[in-house]
Amino acid sequence: MSRKRNHCYMETGASSESQGAFVDSAGPFSRDEEDFSELEPDEQLVCSVTEITEHLGRNITVVLESALSEIRKLVGVRIRVLKMELREKSDEIELLKAKLESAEKDGRVSNFSSLDFRKSEHQKYGAEPKKAKTGTPVVKKENINAICDYLMKDKNQRGAAEVESDHSNQAFGSERDVRTEAQPHGSLSLWPDSGPADTDAETDIFSMLPSASKRMYDYEWMTGVELNSAEFKGDSETKCEDVPPMDEEDENEDSEEGRGSLRSVSDHFPLDTQGSPGEDRSSPAEDSMDRMEPGQQFTSHTFICPFCGTLCPDSSFLEEHIKLMHHGESLLQSTSAGSSSQAEGDSGEAGPASRGAREKKVEGGYECGDCGRHFNYLGNLRQHQRIHTGEKPFVCPECGERFRHTARLKSHRLSHSGAQSPFPCPQCGKGFPVLSGLKRHQRVHTGESPYACPQCGRRFKELGNLYTHMRIHSGATPYTCYQCGRSFRHLGTYKSHRCMPATQMPSEHSPPWAQEDKVQTGRLQGYV
């Protein structure tokens, strides 16, 4: 019995030992599985971060490429515009260089003739001829005002007797002899490099020219005129106005370069002279006009290009400038010259007297006599007055449609030819005849509203819309029906209102501009 018990005890002990060994061997395996399960989420997180990084990198690359392409388009459009402007300026510079060379040649010839004349004069009276340099005197740019002052004095003295001019020439000759003996090696330059000389040296450069030199008088348009004054800036650049237009069309038209209707040198090119009647211009030349004697005359004129406002010394220079720079525009103007002159004759308002009555000179600019609108420059006022007179001098040769401004005609003719507008929108491709129109249109894409109402704070993209809105606060009703006497706040309401057929309108109550835009700005109500 004891043997059996010992045998069973040994079997049970062995089995328990084997079970313990199995449990010990299974323990490390379960711990490895737990560690592996803990590592799997970390690896998945690393993979997801890598995928997100790659996706973001691809998106950023696509966005950068699209942005670069848009920037290239914008820069390309701007470069093309600048190249066109540079090409036009280069052509004009070449023309001016040719004119300058011819002027220098004429100046040298006149210098030689004056020197020969004085040499013969000295030999006649037994005087020893002096030596003079044959080069053209050099005048610094910063001293051009002194030359203008001298030319003004010479112009005021031009009407004196010939005997007095002969005596003055002899006096200048004797003074030159004295100065050349005192300074035998002096330069004929008006101002040396060391600084400006005394006032006696100013007469040296001009005493070399004869008193009747044609080239000097051809360029008298420079005398006593401040070229940086507001008057001449208005003819070349009119980008903004103190008083805004009432509708988008007028705002686009006023933003063009100043091309007011000007006096003509020929039948086809209207020009404006500095001393034209009906104008109230103020310039430094008026002071010299007050000091002139009754027997003298002020004969200098300023010839202005009607298309770009360039100042020209004479009519021939202006005609060449128009042929070279504005050949197409001059043909269009000549096409519409007969019809516009007939319209002016029928209306009876194109005369100097009526124009002077409608052009009021006020402090700081000009005022329209019809609606009271204020302008900085006379050219812009005359463009605006086409609204009141109904004048549309520019005619399309293809369809016969008429326009108030040449820029509108250019844009219209592009529709016939199928060509691209000079200023296309880079976002939507819409074309505009002037750069200011493109800038206003781009506010639609950018969402910019720069004009705010001072009373309610509402903002507008267009200045004309702001002034139309301000009529709500002021109660202004500038559009009046000439049959029933009703007044309207908006032009569209006025045009849609018809209390009597247009054929029954009495002529004495409907002026020619009543069917057009009877624009009366907020200035009449005290808001300008």
Curated annotation (Swiss-Prot):
Annotated spans, Disordered: 1-28, 159-202, 232-293, 333-359, 502-528
Family matches, as Pfam families: zf-C2H2 (PF00096)
Stretches of the chain forming a coiled coil according to its record: 79-106
GO MF term list: DNA-binding transcription factor activity, RNA polymerase II-specific; RNA polymerase II transcription regulatory region sequence-specific DNA binding; zinc ion binding
InterPro entries referenced in this protein's UniProt entry, alphabetically: C2H2-ZF_Transcription_Reg, Znf_C2H2_sf, Znf_C2H2_type
GO BP field: central nervous system myelination; positive regulation of myelination; positive regulation of oligodendrocyte differentiation; regulation of transcription by RNA polymerase II
Name of the featured protein: Zinc finger protein 16-like
Species whose genome carries this gene: Danio rerio
Gene: znf16l
